[in-house]
């Protein structure tokens, strides 16, 4: 193999980094780029006088040389089972080096750890988040090596399709412009500690800043300006134990001072406000917490709890706990025992240390969600508090000593959660002292060029918002401008200053930001930026930004995609509002509409609550309603104008001669709204975490809620709410809101029970939507019978008359509240407090005491308001019943007034004669009918004389009470049955009966 001399600039660059304690970046281009890593690593090891540095190797797909297969091969080589190919340097490198292979999806576990070399391959899988996580783990003097495949020009990266772009594309917007990659390459050209080489380590002329690399003078290099102060502090605490032994382990004056402050708080053993420690990456926060834990053990604290987003983030913390134990002369196994996790995801991280030297003490890791385990805590330490959801951090603070540390800029701290919300709230509520700050870097020395490059690239220093010196213009004098993203991410000096201002407003006014948001802002094809500016005073200076609005176009989804989504459960990327609304209401036509979603509205923190946000939203609504007309004669810019990324032909490329420079033709950064044609939209929407203030803001802006998530957000513990506004009046928005209000009203007693009453009332009332066309049926008697029994109404009547207490009608409040808030009870007028009481007691199921605390009202006043509301409700129900009864009665207009009466044609005498004739005729007819019948058998026998004698005989008392007279007809001896039909007559009895003397005496007589 022919050996080639390596460019001396590579060796000088690495040696300078080791002398200065600064990191060095190499971009290796070519298919054999991986084979150059051992060479660069060998130069590094020869330049340092310490143990061989560890390597963090990150990849998207499994790399057999780095993963388990490579480890097994390295073991076989070490024991001599496999011969090492001397030509293959990678085998020797693999055997002699500790390499930690990580998938990009697992890099969250490397936070807080330190490596000597970081290798990043599979450039298409890189994201700003991954870049920030991995680069910041490299110590001073270490290497960051970025491996790229063969390229004809670095400008090919401008149009490379990145993996993250799949999430940016939507069905209606497929073309992605790689503005972030262009800005990344241009920023590398400005970095003095970055070299671009090919796969035979030939240095490429990326920029003129790396043409000459001169060795630095090692005299005074790497020394801290506060070294004398650190030495003085260590000497002053030398005789004070355990503080002296622990402070002696600190590397910087800031870190030593922080440890001393923590120890001072531990000595008192009294409940104090939480102490905070803030710093940028690599300043030694975790190490300071670890030494403080060792001091707490020495002072006798029994239950010490440590929490962090992930146990692997605490590797440095526990490492310095053990170093503190060594300084205090604790012996492992004799004085303490280490327990590691058996969870495969935690990679055998330390989760517990049991100390048994003088008494039983415990250092225990708990997950951020296990706040219920802190009841017996004596000390709680929270590492990387900014990466933990803010509600969980608030729950952790209790009646025990709390130390917390967090990154306020850098990857973990790119949100205002800790620096602006939590710490300021602690200072206000608990009278806590200002947070301790670590300025000096430990992982690498100050003025590290790689740190400056990364901060500028990802705008990680945006936590400090520049103040505006131009005063407060009136909102009506401010105008909204469209921001051209090609110009914003062109890496022009003015554009960079404007971008940093814009991102700083984002970070300071939004809960959580990540570096990935910057790439979405730059590359997502459906996203657009607007900013509200005051009156421009100077034309030679950048205008001050008051409000930033980021929007995303959504909708225009095909019928086939809608069918796949709703029928098969598949959802495409993006289009948040169309998919959620279509799924919520089963409307297959809504995703076909074109809409715009307001992703963020960020107001400068010094000018919040002054009407600027409302003004910006109003101008945006007018813009998409096409109310901004161009009064000039010049042509209007197309909405697709300004595609600033130039495609370069391969014949024109030369990697060995190419120098990267910003584009010479840059479009206008800011455009007036009338200079750009707006996209056609059917609605404007927004999605945000529901709070009372934000709901009030969007309602005042004319938006209507149509969706409320039942699952709260893990980071903010808020429920996502979608609100819509239509430029033109549409009936479907009122129907959506009517259904939304009905659903939310039912869920307020379940999922949304913990909501504040005023928030629930705000959800149920909206003046921006017309619900008249979708009004429900007003309460009537049949509906009243469905909801209430007569006895229920009697109970309500009894309470209204003060004849019973309110608990007797508590069960009726649910139905009353449902009817009232659905608008079914016509004529029932309640004030705002009465509405809140009815909603809280009837729907949310809150108690009177809890509601009194929430509304800040005494119980007797609350019940008085409640009584008045129920009295009015009873009157409405009575009016419904009265109307029903009146409806069943004849109205006065329906009564007969005699208009249809006619005079009689006959006189009274003639009418009586006529009736008598009819009666006589009827009697004669009846008599004739009776004569025709045979009534002889019913004739009573005997004469008048016979009946008189019989009566006299009976009257004297000699008889038996029966009257008997002679009939004059002789009866036969046997019974005779007369039949009308002789053939059917039954035969006479053949058996002859004996004559009875009594029967013979009574023959011929008839008994009555």
UniProtKB/Swiss-Prot annotation:
GO terms for biological process: ribosomal small subunit biogenesis; rRNA acetylation involved in maturation of SSU-rRNA; tRNA acetylation; tRNA wobble cytosine modification. Acetyl-CoA binds at residues 601-603, 608-614, 700. The modification Phosphoserine is found at residue 907. Residues 989-1008 have a biased composition (Basic residues). One of its GO terms (cellular component) is nucleolus. Its EC number is 2.3.1.-. It is found in: Nucleus, Nucleolus. Residues 970-982 have a biased composition (Basic and acidic residues). It holds the Pfam family GNAT_acetyltr_2. It catalyses: a cytidine in 18S rRNA + acetyl-CoA + ATP + H2O = an N(4)-acetylcytidine in 18S rRNA + ADP + phosphate + CoA + H(+); a cytidine in tRNA + acetyl-CoA + ATP + H2O = an N(4)-acetylcytidine in tRNA + ADP + phosphate + CoA + H(+). One of its GO terms (molecular function) is tRNA N4-acetyltransferase activity. The keyword rRNA processing applies. Keywords: Acyltransferase, ATP-binding, Developmental protein, Nucleotide-binding, Nucleus, Phosphoprotein, Repressor, rRNA processing, Transcription, Transcription regulation, Transferase, tRNA processing. Residues 531-713 form the N-acetyltransferase domain. RNA cytidine acetyltransferase with specificity toward both 18S rRNA and tRNAs. Catalyzes the formation of N(4)-acetylcytidine (ac4C) in 18S rRNA. Required for early nucleolar cleavages of precursor rRNA at sites A0, A1 and A2 during 18S rRNA synthesis. Catalyzes the formation of ac4C in serine and leucine tRNAs. Requires a tRNA-binding adapter protein for full tRNA acetyltransferase activity but not for 18S rRNA acetylation. Polycomb group (PcG) protein. HAMAP family: RNA_acetyltr_Nat10 (MF_03211). Component of the PRC1 complex (PSC, PC, PH and dRING1) in 0-12 hours Drosophila embryos. This complex is distinct from the Esc/E(z) complex, which contains many other PcG proteins like Esc, E(z), Su(z)12, HDAC1/Rpd3, Caf1-55 and probably Pho. The two complexes however cooperate and interact together during the first 3 hours of development to establish PcG silencing. Part of the small subunit (SSU) processome, composed of more than 70 proteins and the RNA chaperone small nucleolar RNA (snoRNA) U3. This is RNA cytidine acetyltransferase. It comes from Drosophila melanogaster (Fruit fly). The gene is l(1)G0020.
């Amino acid at each position: 193999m022919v050996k080639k001399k390596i460019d001396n600039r590579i060796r000088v660059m690495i040696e300078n980094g080791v002398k200065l304690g600064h990191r060095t970046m190499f971009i290796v281009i070519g298919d054999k780029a991986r084979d150059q890593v051992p060479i660069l690593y060998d130069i590094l090891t020869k330049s340092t006088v310490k143990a061989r540095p560890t390597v963090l190797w990150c990849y998207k797909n499994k790399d057999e040389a780095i993963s388990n297969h490579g480890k097994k091969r390295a073991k076989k080589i070490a024991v001599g089972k496999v011969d090492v190919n001397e030509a293959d340097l990678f085998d020797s490198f693999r055997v002699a080096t500790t390499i930690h292979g990580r998938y990009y999806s697992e890099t969250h576990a490397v936070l807080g750890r330190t490596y000597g070399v970081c290798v990043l391959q599979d450039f298409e899988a890189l994201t700003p988040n991954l870049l920030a996580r991995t680069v910041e783990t490299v110590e001073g003097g270490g290497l960051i090596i970025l491996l790229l495949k063969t390229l004809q020009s670095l400008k090919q990266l401008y149009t490379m399709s990145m993996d993250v772009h799949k999430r940016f594309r939507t069905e209606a917007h497929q073309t992605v412009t790689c503005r972030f990659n262009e800005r990344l390459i241009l920023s590398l050209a400005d970095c003095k500690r970055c070299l671009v080489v090919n796969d035979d380590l030939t240095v490429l002329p990326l920029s003129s800043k790396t043409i000459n690399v001169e060795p630095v003078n090692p005299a005074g290099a790497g020394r801290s300006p506060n070294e004398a102060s650190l030495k003085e502090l260590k000497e002053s605490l030398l005789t004070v134990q355990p503080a002296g032994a622990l402070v002696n382990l600190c590397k910087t004056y800031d870190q030593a001072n922080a440890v001393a402050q923590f120890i001072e708080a531990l000595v008192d053993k009294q409940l104090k406000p939480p102490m905070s420690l803030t710093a940028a990456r690599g300043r030694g926060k975790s190490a300071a917490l670890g030494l403080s834990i060792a001091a707490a053990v020495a002072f006798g604290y029994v239950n010490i709890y440590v929490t962090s987003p992930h146990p692997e983030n605490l590797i440095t913390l526990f490492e310095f706990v053990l170093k503190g134990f060594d300084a205090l002369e604790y012996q492992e196994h004799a004085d303490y025992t280490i327990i590691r996790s058996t969870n495969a995801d935690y990679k055998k991280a330390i989760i517990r240390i049991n100390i048994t030297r003088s008494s039983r003490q415990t250092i225990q890791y708990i997950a951020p969600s296990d706040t219920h385990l802190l009841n017996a805590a004596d000390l709680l330490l929270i590492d990387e508090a900014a990466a933990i959801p803010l509600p969980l951090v608030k729950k952790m603070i209790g009646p025990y000593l709390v130390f917390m540390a967090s990154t306020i800029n850098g990857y973990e701290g790119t949100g205002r959660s800790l620096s602006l919300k939590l710490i300021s709230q602690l200072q206000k509520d608990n009278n806590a002292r200002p947070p301790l700050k670590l300025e000096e870097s430990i992982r690498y020395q100050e003025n590290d060029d790689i740190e400056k490059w990364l901060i500028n690239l990802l705008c990680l220093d945006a936590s400090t918002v520049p103040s505006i010196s131009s005063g407060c213009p009136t909102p009506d004098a401010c105008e909204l401008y469209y921001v051209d993203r090609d110009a914003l991410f062109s890496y022009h000096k003015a554009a960079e200053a404007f971008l940093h201002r814009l991102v700083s407003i984002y970070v300071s006014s939004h809960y959580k930001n990540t570096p990935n948001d910057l790439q979405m802002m730059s590359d997502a094809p459906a996203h657009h930026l607007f900013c509200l500016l005051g009156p421009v005073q100077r034309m030679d200076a950048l205008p001050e930004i008051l409000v930033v609005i980021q929007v995303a176009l959504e909708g225009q989804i095909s019928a086939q995609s809608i069918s796949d989504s709703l029928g098969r459960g598949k959802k495409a990327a993006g289009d948040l509002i169309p998919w959620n609304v279509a799924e919520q209401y089963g409307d297959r036509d809504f995703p076909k509409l074109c809409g715009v979603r307001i992703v963020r509205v960020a107001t400068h923190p010094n000018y919040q609550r002054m009407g600027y946000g409302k003004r910006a939203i109003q101008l945006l609504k007018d813009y998409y309603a096409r109310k901004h007309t161009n009064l000039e004669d010049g042509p209007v810019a197309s909405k697709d104008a300004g595609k600033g990324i130039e495609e370069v032909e391969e014949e024109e490329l030369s990697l060995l001669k190419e120098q990267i420079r910003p584009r010479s033709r840059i479009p206008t950064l800011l455009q007036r709204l009338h200079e750009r044609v707006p996209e056609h939209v059917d609605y404007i929407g927004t999605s945000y975490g529901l709070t009372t203030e934000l709901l009030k803001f969007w309602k005042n802006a004319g938006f209507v809620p149509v969706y409320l998530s039942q699952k709260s957000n893990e980071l903010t513990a808020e429920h996502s709410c979608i609100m819509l506004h239509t430029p033109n009046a549409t009936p479907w928005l009122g129907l959506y809101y009517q259904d939304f209000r009905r659903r939310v009203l039912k869920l307020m007693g379940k999922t949304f029970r913990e909501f504040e009453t005023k928030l629930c009332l705000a959800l149920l009332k909206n003046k921006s939507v017309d619900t008249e066309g979708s009004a429900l049926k007003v309460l009537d008697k049949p509906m009243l019978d469905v909801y209430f029994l007569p006895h229920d109404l009697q109970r309500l009547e009894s309470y209204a008359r003060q004849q019973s207490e309110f608990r007797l009608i508590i069960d009726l409040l649910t139905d009353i509240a449902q009817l009232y808030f659905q608008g079914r009870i016509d004529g029932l007028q309640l004030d705002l407090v009465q509405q809140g009481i009815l909603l809280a007691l009837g729907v949310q199921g809150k108690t009177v005491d809890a509601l009194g605390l929430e509304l800040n009202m005494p119980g007797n006043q609350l019940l008085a308001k409640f009584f008045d509301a129920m009295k009015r409700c009873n009157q409405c129900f009575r009016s419904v019943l009265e109307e029903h009864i009146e409806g069943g009665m004849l109205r006065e207009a329906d009564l007969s007034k005699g208009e249809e009466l006619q005079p009689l044609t006959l006189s009274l005498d003639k009418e009586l004669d006529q009736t008598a004739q009819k009666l006589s005729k009827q009697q004669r007819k009846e008599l004739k009918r009776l004569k025709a019948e045979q009534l002889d058998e019913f004739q009573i026998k005997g004469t008048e004389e016979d009946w008189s004698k019989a009566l006299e005989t009976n009257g004297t008392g000699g008889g038996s009470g029966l009257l008997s007279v002679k009939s004059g007809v002789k009866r036969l001896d046997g019974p005779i049955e007369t039949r009308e039909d002789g053939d059917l007559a039954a035969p006479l009895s053949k058996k002859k009966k004996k004559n009875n003397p009594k029967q013979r005496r009574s023959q011929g007589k008839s008994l009555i």
